[in-house]
């Protein structure tokens, strides 16, 4: 997490401006198909990328399946998918399994920035939460050492009654990120209503006056309210791009795409060209459109060099 914040501080002046993002040029038409299996968080963005990509390459077909980031590494290892979108970086054990099979690591691309959001029903009057309080709401362990278990909104001075928890299942990279950063590796409470996707978490909280949940910002709707977060009581920050980049908002993260690229070999034309499109102005505009944040222009050349 510290590494991500330091990196973002170095590039914050470049990401805000679209200058440096090059228009996509389809110099050679490509045909063929590929499969993408992985992150639910990236599911909609993958579909939007494909929709525009097909305007340049009409015969290309890419199947997209978003059942959680943990489904991506096995799919890439077994070659049931050529594109593996993930809302977290691969774990060491996942990288080890890939290398055991192929003798080299998978290639990682950082395709977007996200702010993981904690949200409540739109009528909840809450003004903000510390990470300690969020941990005490969601975790049975309270590794951040908050003074008490928060199972009732009255404990935060909000007259709503029992807290109703919504979250993702363990196949989700968002689940893993939240567990690692907010809960400091602690365990979720057993009464969290686990949902199959981020949209379901948002839907559940939107109709539950006592609800609280989490997801990437791309799934946020007007039916719920994002809770500003902070490390200290009274110092809360929203999910603005500026706050993510300067590290004040504590839950910023990269979104990733992994591929199987043997050293000194080229990817299939469909996969390579699709990745080139993602890092173009058109591709990164779709990131904006889907509610996320584009990657810094300063890193795009380095990401594209991984294709060589």
Placement of each model-derived feature along the sequence:
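Sec-dependent N-terminal signal peptides
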Residues: 4-12
């Amino acid at each position: 997490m510290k590494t991500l914040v330091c990196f973002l501080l170095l590039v914050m002046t470049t990401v805000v401006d679209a200058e440096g993002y090059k228009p996509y040029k389809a110099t050679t038409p490509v045909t063929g198909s590929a499969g993408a299996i992985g992150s639910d968080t990236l599911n909609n963005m993958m579909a939007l990328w494909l929709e525009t990509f097909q305007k340049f390459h009409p015969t290309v077909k890419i199947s997209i399946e978003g059942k959680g980031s943990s489904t991506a590494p096995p799919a890439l290892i077994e070659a049931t998918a050529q594109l593996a979108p993930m809302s977290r970086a691969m774990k060491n054990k996942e990288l080890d399994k890939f290398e055991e099979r192929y003798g080299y690591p998978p290639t990682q691309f950082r395709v977007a920035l996200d702010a993981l959001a904690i949200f409540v029903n739109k009528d909840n009057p809450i003004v903000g939460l510390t990470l300690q309080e969020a941990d005490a709401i969601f975790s049975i362990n309270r590794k951040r050492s908050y003074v008490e278990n928060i199972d009732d909104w009255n404990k935060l001075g909000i007259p709503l009654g029992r807290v109703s928890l919504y979250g993702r299942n363990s196949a989700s990279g968002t689940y893993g990120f939240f567990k690692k950063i907010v809960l400091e590796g602690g365990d979720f409470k057993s009464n969290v209503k686990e949902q199959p996707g981020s949209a379901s978490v948002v839907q559940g909280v939107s109709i539950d006056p006592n609800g609280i949940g989490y997801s990437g910002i791309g799934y946020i709707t007007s039916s719920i309210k994002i809770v500003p977060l902070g490390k200290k009581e009274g110092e809360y920050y929203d999910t603005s791009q500026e706050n993510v980049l300067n590290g004040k908002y504590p839950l910023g993260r990269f979104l990733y795409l992994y591929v199987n690229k043997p050293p000194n070999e080229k990817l299939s034309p469909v996969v390579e060209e699709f990745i080139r499109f993602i890092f173009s102005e058109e591709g990164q505009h779709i990131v904006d459109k889907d509610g996320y944040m584009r990657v810094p222009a300063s890193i795009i050349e380095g990401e594209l060099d991984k294709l060589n």
